[in-house]
Design a protein with these regions (language model features):
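Hydrolase active-site cap/lid region
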Residues: 297-347
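Short beta-strand element of the alpha/beta-hydrolase
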Residues: 184-186, 194-204
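Surface-exposed, short loops/turns at beta-strand junctions within beta-sandwich domains
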Residues: 91-97
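Alpha/beta-hydrolase fold nucleophile elbow
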Residues: 283-293
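Short beta-strand elements
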Residues: 109-129
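N-terminal cap/lid segment of alpha/beta-hydrolase-fold proteins
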Residues: 33-37, 146-192
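Proline/serine/threonine-rich low-complexity linkers at boundaries of modular beta-sandwich domains
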Residues: 20-28
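Cap/lid segment of the alpha/beta-hydrolase catalytic domain
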Residues: 207-268, 276, 324-334
């Protein structure tokens, strides 16, 4: 009984501390003066900066801020003191793009960040990256060559992950070379019938996957894949070791060759995942979607563009976009190859145009 009472007191203390922390939390709020965040070229945008503590403006707070085109600020100031906890900043853009206001507040030895980004004539944005003349031909031939390697799929039931409506498996299949596999988590409705399918492609990183039994339980086949050619049900420590070791910065591997690029095998793997789904007897042969965010958003767009069997697409803030925007000092998509890794040589430029 004493142990139970002691545990109860500990829980009360934790709750009290949590409430106190939340009540005193610091927030940096940056707001543009258009509710839709969209502006005409040359129109002034006024950002209101507020530093709040417990929902009240914090006086005499010190901030740093950057203002200008996304990733290329033209106004940078440090150690600005806000006497009443608020500040108004103005900017504009003469060409289509995004104006960003980024603020860091320094309070009691800690740094808190906030930002807002307004759009200037976003519908007028045009890609800088050039489309190679042989783009589709290259990928058609690459996939044709990959398909000479049979899928040889393997499926292992995961009883602990099965639900009332769906069976869940770890699956793997060959992609472009003997022994080279993609791994993922497959969910198939238990009820006999033909079903639509959804392919989930991942954001950047190295991690395990749980699969998708929640989007439409018992009504859709789902396949959530990893891209690194390793099982997706191992201990987290394995993925952490790989992320910090052999797969650290994997997105830079093979940057000098379209064939050796790390993403060559990844794109082929995503397309072979479509092959695998289409081989399932439970697939209805009519409705196949692909979705993902960031790196997964890019892979969603790529997969849908290169495979006509994909009938619907949902890409969330896709990465790997317009790498050559760097040359016009305009933000490109992650991983911002030339922004972080220096000016490219011609081979690197040729390579990124295929990804």
């Amino acid at each position: 009984m004493k142990r139970v009472f002691s545990l109860f007191l500990c829980l009360l203390c934790v709750c009290a501390v949590t409430a106190q922390i939340r009540g005193n939390e610091i927030r940096v709020v940056v707001s543009p003066d258009h509710s839709d965040w969209v502006y005409r070229l040359n129109e002034k945008c006024t950002f209101t900066v507020r530093v709040l503590k417990a929902q009240n403006l914090l006086s005499d707070v010190k901030i740093d801020y950057e203002l200008g085109p996304e990733m290329y600020p033209t106004e940078v100031k440090k150690d600005v003191v806000l006497k009443d906890g608020t500040l108004k900043l103005q900017g504009t853009m003469k060409t289509a793009g995004f104006l960003r206001c980024k603020v860091k507040a320094h309070v009691d030895g800690r740094t808190y960040e906030g930002l807002a980004t307004s759009a200037y004539a976003p519908e007028q944005l045009q890609p800088v990256t050039k489309l190679p003349a042989d783009f589709r031909d290259y990928w058609a031939k690459t996939l044709e060559e990959a398909r000479k390697t049979p899928l040889n799929p393997l499926m292992t039931l995961l009883p602990e992950r099965c639900t009332e409506t769906d069976n869940v498996y770890q699956v793997s299949f060959q992609t472009k070379a003997w022994g080279g596999r993609f791994y993922g988590i497959l969910s198939i409705p238990k009820k006999e019938g033909k079903y639509p399918a959804l392919l989930r492609v991942p954001g950047a990183g190295v991690r395990p996957y749980a699969g998708d039994t929640y989007t439409a339980p018992g009504k859709v086949i789902t396949l959530e894949v990893g891209i690194h050619g390793i099982p997706v049900t191992m201990q987290q420590s394995v993925y952490d070791a790989l992320a910090g070791g052999a797969l650290s910065n994997y997105w830079t591997f093979g940057r000098d060759s379209r064939d050796a690029s790390y993403y060559n095998r990844v794109v082929v793997g995503a397309l072979r995942a479509v092959d695998f789904i289409c081989s399932l007897p439970q697939y209805n042969g009519k409705a196949l979607g692909v979705t993902g965010s960031s790196q997964g958003g890019a892979l969603s767009v790529i997969t849908a563009a290169l495979d006509s069997r994909v009938t619907f697409l949902a890409a969330v803030h896709p990465a790997l976009c317009d790498h050559e925007a760097f040359f016009k000092k305009r933000a490109c998509g992650w991983p911002h190859y030339f922004y972080y890794y220096g000016a490219p040589d011609e081979k690197q430029l040729e390579t990124v145009r295929y990804y």
